A protein has these predicted regions:
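NTP/phosphate- and nucleic-acid-binding module
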Residues: 1-116
Length: 116
């Protein structure tokens, strides 16, 4: 699986991936990335438009950041995005409008746990 940065020393806490070609996907991904950034979460936003989802996922694996948020096809169908925890392998779908708050809370809890 490769590198898995501990949250307290990772260069970024979260990588936000926008997949597909739908402009709405990129808009939502940017909104979530901005909200996370405003809340003090260190974010790497992959907004490359001419790169396939497979390449983005492979790059995310190589980077090994603690959390990945995927905005893609489920947004249009269900209004959800996916949060992936690198350490545990857990994947969960959350409503797009709650994703920033939930992920911010998750990062803060992980940072707090790492301090003790």
């Amino acid at each position: 699986k490769g590198l898995a940065w501990p949250v307290q020393i990772a260069p970024y806490h979260v990588q936000v991936l926008a997949t597909g070609k739908d402009e709405a996907v990129f808009d939502v991904a940017e909104q979530i990335a901005s909200a996370l950034d405003a809340d003090g979460v260190e974010v790497l936003y992959d907004d490359r438009r001419r790169v396939s989802a497979g390449v983005k996922f492979a790059d995310a694996e190589l980077l090994g950041l603690p959390y990945t948020l995927v905005v893609g096809r489920d947004l249009a169908k269900e209004g959800t995005v996916e949060i992936r925890d690198r350490r545990t392998g857990e994947r969960r779908s959350v409503p797009a409008d709650a994703a920033a708050a939930e992920l911010s809370s998750t990062v803060r809890a992980a940072l707090e746990a790492a301090r003790h």
